[in-house]
Amino acid sequence: MPGVRYLLLGRLGYLAMKIPVKLTCINGLLLLVAVFSGGPVHAQQQVQPGYLAPADSLHIESWLPPPPAEDSLPNAADVEAYLQSRSLIGTARAEEAHADDVVKPAEAVAPRFSYILGVTLDRRNAPRLMRMMDLVRSDAEWVVLPVKKAVTSGGRRRPFVDFPNLPKCPLVYDALGTTGSYPSGHAMTGWLWGSILAEIAPGYADALFARGEAFGDSRVVCGFHYPSDVAAGRLVASALLARLHADPRFRSDLAEAKKEIATLLARRAQ
């Protein structure tokens, strides 16, 4: 999509901010208290447990680059890409972006990808896949907490906040106005779904990766994120998936999910 995708160069050399965290467990929930310079994003934030224990999870604050500085060339490129993408509002691409405004539970996200396979993915047809993707989403939420800073704590403003009078998708924006834009959690979700389904059904890999990419790009179209937010989300998703492959529970669920999808595809072919 011209004006939305561009290659980010020369940013991986930045040092990520170190963020101290305090972790406790209450009623089976992971409770994270993150202390950021400039004030906390949230005093407390609860995340459902996924596959990875906190000590075994990624610590992306040690390697993920910060968002572009406001006076930097990468930020100028972000803004230009966003402004160009305003021409998509009112088109079929914007309608697709509106429909992509889902992130969980798995059954809500599945239809954005399952049409590529030509099967229905839900808790009746693919219970292990649905459970697996919900757990993966929890891992994604956990891993991004240390860097997902609120605007009041120095987090990056979202495009619709920077340009409130420009056209955007007919969605509810107010709740996200004070939350940080970087990195994009939806882009993480899209890339995880595309990557995992491509591994499960490799014959559809190209279309699934394209859908996962478009799912993240939709956040630019609707004004929730800049392109570098989306790129960072995909980077974190790829790293998280690599880490998950070292977890035996994830590998076991993935193997069972492959069987579920193989059965559905075989049934469809009859």
Where do the language-model regions lie?
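Interfacial helix-loop-helix junctions of multi-pass membrane proteins
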Residues: F215-H245
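Sec/Tat signal peptide C-region and signal peptidase I cleavage site
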Residues: G39-A43
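Bacterial N-terminal signal peptides that target proteins for export
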Residues: K18-G28
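Hydrophobic alpha-helical bundle signature of multipass membrane enzymes
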Residues: Q45-V221, D253
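Bacterial N-terminal signal peptides
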Residues: I26-S37
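Acidic, carboxylate-rich catalytic segments that either coordinate divalent cations
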Residues: H245-Q270
